Regions:
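SAM-dependent methyltransferase catalytic region
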Residues: 2-228
């Protein structure tokens, strides 16, 4: 699913892409209306969202806008805390998309939106270290694959990183989970053929323990890219 600006709401990129992939743009006002149904979660900085057909940015851009506004309200006066909270916000958003060009477009839109919002809030550019961290998080969280088969486009299982920020000193615990493991015993609005679905995860009520595929040592969040 994709979203366009109100000023230029194209419904499709091409008829061929609609025929081949069912790719249709979604109006921004409709995206916001749907997100308003879970408004409190979209404004909680660490609330996790997974969009299983994320297109070129759709819901994720609007979720980022809401989360970054929450970061501004809480931490704008302390740049160290703002930087860390903004990384938490980005780390909590996940997407799967079938088309490689859309994956790249989605990552770029989110990155550009982050940098623009950062400048507006801090009246300065993000540090090179922070920008590198955010790019890394987006590369790990926005994946090319099929959420129905739970496989990446290279045939490997879709695997997401769980980023858990510990305390206020910038330390992060990373654990990798296969999507199939995360969705075991979980029901959500998995899209039917020709339809789209949105998974709003993180209900705060875990029902059983998921088994990580891999765990990493506690790391400073700005150094996450060093531990691929």
């Amino acid at each position: 699913m994709n979203v366009t600006d109100d000023k230029q709401e194209r419904q499709v990129v091409s008829r061929q892409r609609v025929a081949d992939h069912g790719e249709v743009y979604t109006a921004k006002r409709e995206v916001n209306a749907m997100l308003d149904l879970v408004k409190e979660e979209t404004e909680r900085i660490d609330s996790r969202f997974l969009e299983p057909a994320c297109g070129n940015g759709n819901f994720l851009v609007e979720i980022l806008n809401r989360k970054m506004e929450a970061v501004r309200r809480q931490f704008a006066r302390n740049r160290f805390e703002y930087d860390q909270a903004s990384a938490v916000a980005v780390s909590s958003m996940y997407g799967v998309e079938l088309l490689p060009d859309n994956v790249e477009a989605c990552r770029n839109r989110l990155m550009n939106q982050y940098l623009e919002t950062y400048r507006e809030h801090q009246h300065a550019d993000a540090s090179p270290e922070l920008e590198r961290c955010i790019r890394f998080l987006l590369r790990k969280n926005i994946l090319c694959g099929d959420a129905l088969t739970m496989l990446q486009n290279n045939g490997e299982p879709i695997t997401f990183c769980e980023w858990t920020f510990i305390g206020t000193n910038g330390k992060v615990k990373r654990r990798d989970f296969e999507l199939s493991e995360l969705l075991r015993n979980v029901e959500y609005d998995k899209p039917k053929p020709g339809e789209e679905g949105l998974l709003f995860a993180d209900t705060g009520e875990p029902t059983f323990v998921h088994l990580p595929k891999r765990e990493y040592p506690l790391t400073d969040y700005l150094k996450l890219p060093d531990y691929e």
